[in-house]
Amino acid sequence: MAIDDDISFLERVPTLSLLGRQALRILAIGAETRYIHSGEVLFKRGDEADGAYVIQEGRFNLSSKDGRELTVGPCTLLGEVALFSETRRPATARALEPSTVLRIPRFLFVRMLDSFPEAARKLRESLAARLDQATREISNVRAVLDAHEPK
């Protein structure tokens, strides 16, 4: 894909769409395109994560330690947390068909945020809203569990 095509694609990825075209240009230029065969493992649960992947084409099966599975496809950002901090992969990602991904290394993402403070602000606000929503959902689940707890 040409750089402008990659930028247009990245604009369709929910988290990345907040960043703006110039910030996405940095990511598109520095991202690595990887072609993955059907059945090939992109990463394994427990692997060190030094960046994220955006699925351009194809589908992946994500399997977690507890046996849960999820199928994801184009415009999915895999490993979002790894863009911000050192972490390990929480699941294994295996291609279900020939697939293409863009690998965004953490150092590139951090450099982009340093260069585009407005993009960093928008991203911080979005992540704060998502964290707030997750906290409310956890509180709701806890309230339901507490209501059913034997006294």
Task: State each model region's role.
Residues 1-151:
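Cytosolic regulatory regions built on CNB/CRP/Popeye-like sensor folds
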